[in-house]
Amino acid sequence: KDALEHTGFAPK
């Protein structure tokens, strides 16, 4: 999992 998803950015 990317840390981006925690910041609100979901690459999926």
From Swiss-Prot:
UniProt PTM: Glycosylated.
GO BP term (any one): shell calcification
Domain of life: Eukaryota
Tissue: Nacreous and prismatic layers of the shell.
Gene Ontology MF terms: calcium ion binding
UniProt keyword terms in alphabetical order: Calcium, Glycoprotein
Function: Calcium-binding.
Other remarks on this protein: On the 2D-gel the determined pI of this protein is: 7, its MW is: 29 kDa.
Name of this protein: Calcium-binding shell glycoprotein P29
Species per Swiss-Prot/TrEMBL record: Unio pictorum (Painter's mussel)
